[in-house]
């Protein structure tokens, strides 16, 4: 968790919204209980990844049945504070890929997402950390 906090603190936001999201995520990570599980009804961590072909001319997306739309791959931390492990597991589960190389270990983007229109809604927000 200390590594994640360090990454969050050193992350340079892309815009004002991401700056606000970053501060909220840092505050919640420092103070909230169960921030890596769905037990936290206010918010919890999720991860996503942009999967890019080796020659960087294609991306892999997955169809989300609940939202009826295409999206990048990802999922919930489900108690694991090592978000890199979480995204590797999600990539394998959702695509079958096991030989994945990160272009960077740095945070690609941060978002606080509301959970709207989801039939399994049991939380208000998700903290999303994206890898590339």
Model-identified regions with their sequence ranges:
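Generic N-terminal amphipathic, Lys/Arg-enriched alpha-helix
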Residues: 2-12
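Conserved Nudix-box catalytic region and its N-terminal flanking loop in Nudix hydrolases
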Residues: 55-100
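A structural signal for well-ordered alpha-helical scaffolds and beta->alpha junctions
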Residues: 1, 18, 22, 84, ...
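Generic structural "secondary-structure junction" signal
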Residues: 38, 47, 72-74, 79, ...
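A glycine-rich, hydrophobic loop/mini-helix early in the fold
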Residues: 34-69
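Active-site segment of metal-dependent pyrophosphate-handling enzymes
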Residues: 96-132
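Histidine-centered active-site/metal-ligand motif
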Residues: 44, 64, 76, 93, ...
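Acidic, metal-coordinating catalytic segment for phosphate/diphosphate chemistry
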Residues: 10-48
